[in-house]
């Protein structure tokens, strides 16, 4: 029976609860989730006073599998764990050699492999060993049609509400660029805190991100559905005059 794939939310929940795994291989097309999990581990595993001797950051272009294994086999100094993060691990040419360590990892080492924009071959030893003894997570791009619900979910995690139209406006304007989206949501969260408010509205987005609440895809689709040809033409003309404000190509 195939092992159920763990979700981003489940990984983050376990890390927050300090239920760490000895190996994390974070791979796939979407860098946002890989960065978020890695940042959470960097914040959670070690106290600040423990990091000088027990936290190692390596880069794929400057290291190799043997060096990573040697570092992982060290024991921590005056700490329960040591944390090793390998960034840009897709550049480690002999990365499959890591399987010899991952088959029997140290419980005191937390090894984090950032394998961005690619995926390991799940049929080979490294992926199989990671799946058995740690976390093998594939970070996938979110389809455009799922972005509004994803934005709503992100804001719920921050205990902030968002109007459906506002979520659609952000989705249309930013697409599925999650890093850019996260920066804009951070900005909106700060503004809401200053206003002592807990809800993102189309007006808030229009005022602070520069997306028109009247001339956007949400309103265009609504006008077409209601057969409001005058309004649909007005929005189309606005898109033609302001191509940077229009996230889709008009035909």
Which residues fall in each region the model found?
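Conserved beta/loop motifs at nucleotide-recognition and modification sites
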Residues: 1-251
């Amino acid at each position: 029976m195939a092992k159920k794939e763990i979700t981003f939310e489940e990984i983050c929940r376990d890390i927050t609860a300090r239920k760490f795994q000895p190996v994390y291989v974070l791979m796939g097309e979407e860098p946002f989730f890989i960065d978020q999990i890695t940042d959470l581990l960097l914040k959670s595993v070690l106290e600040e006073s423990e990091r000088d001797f027990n936290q190692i950051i390596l880069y794929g272009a400057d290291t190799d599998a043997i060096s990573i294994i040697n570092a992982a086999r060290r024991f921590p100094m005056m700490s329960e764990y040591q944390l090793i993060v390998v960034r840009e691990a897709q550049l480690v040419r002999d990365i499959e050699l890591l399987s010899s360590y991952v088959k029997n990892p140290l419980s005191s080492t937390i090894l984090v492999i950032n394998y961005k924009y690619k995926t390991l071959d799940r049929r080979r030893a490294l992926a199989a060993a990671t799946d058995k003894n740690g976390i093998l997570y594939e970070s996938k791009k979110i389809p455009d049609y799922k972005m509004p619900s994803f934005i709503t979910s992100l804001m719920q995690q921050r205990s902030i509400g968002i109007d459906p139209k506002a979520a659609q406006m952000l989705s249309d304007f930013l697409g599925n660029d999650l890093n850019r989206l996260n920066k804009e949501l951070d900005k909106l969260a700060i503004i809401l805190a200053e206003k002592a408010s807990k809800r993102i509205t189309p007006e808030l987005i229009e005022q602070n991100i520069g997306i028109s609440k009247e001339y956007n895809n949400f309103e265009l689709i609504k006008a077409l559905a209601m057969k409001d040809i005058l309004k649909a033409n007005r929005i189309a003309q606005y898109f033609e005059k302001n191509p940077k404000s229009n996230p889709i190509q008009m035909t």
